[in-house]
């Protein structure tokens, strides 16, 4: 077992020293999650690496189902399904639950067409040999990591039989902070993965990436802002279409 500690100032390293079977890679510098991932993958020698989050629960067959997908040599990454636990009818829980059902369906359809577009950190796996070191300031490490594998010519398989169950955001404020981080990470990803915007090189993957991700993170916010004044102008114009049955 290997533990990666990143700038921890508690007694983690001291306590782990009592277990000789545990390897501890400690860095006193706070490099962040991506830096820790880079260090961890530097010592991993298994052909497949499965990623998950500490706050998620996997179904019992999850790992076996994910590994089975790699029987196809064209698959370089496998994305599991994220499910939101205890979703109600109001607030952050309902909003997040609906979004992930929609997102999961898109991934399933993308997979049927050619390749899923990215993986969520709650559950995904990669071929170790295809991992590329990420820049330490990468915000969406799971998405960028998986798309860099797709850029090498491998498919991202979607496995709905393997799922990770996660509790929803506590409130709309927490959900708002998470969405802001994803939005910022999305813009960063579009720039850093700009080579995927070449339709002549990436073909179907280009279409999937642009329609599913790039437009959502770049054009959609602009369109939403433009819709407000356009709707106000339409309202004030008294256009008969507003009152048509």
Predicted features, each with a name:
Residues 70-102, 137-141, 146-212:
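Catalytic donor/gating beta->alpha subdomain of glycosyltransferases that bind UDP-sugars
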Residues 21-24, 155:
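Conserved beta-strand segments of alpha/beta enzyme cores
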Residues 109, 113, 213, 217-221:
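Loop-to-transmembrane-helix entry motif
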Residues 13-17, 33-42, 146-147:
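Short, conserved alpha-helix that lines the donor NDP-sugar binding/gating region
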Residues 166, 216-245:
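Membrane-embedded multi-pass helical conduit in multi-pass membrane proteins
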Residues 5-13, 29, 56:
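A conserved acidic beta->alpha catalytic loop
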Residues 1-4, 23:
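Hydrophobic targeting segments
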Residues 26-29, 34-36, 42, 46, ...:
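Long helical/loop segments within the catalytic core of UDP-sugar-dependent glycosyltransferases
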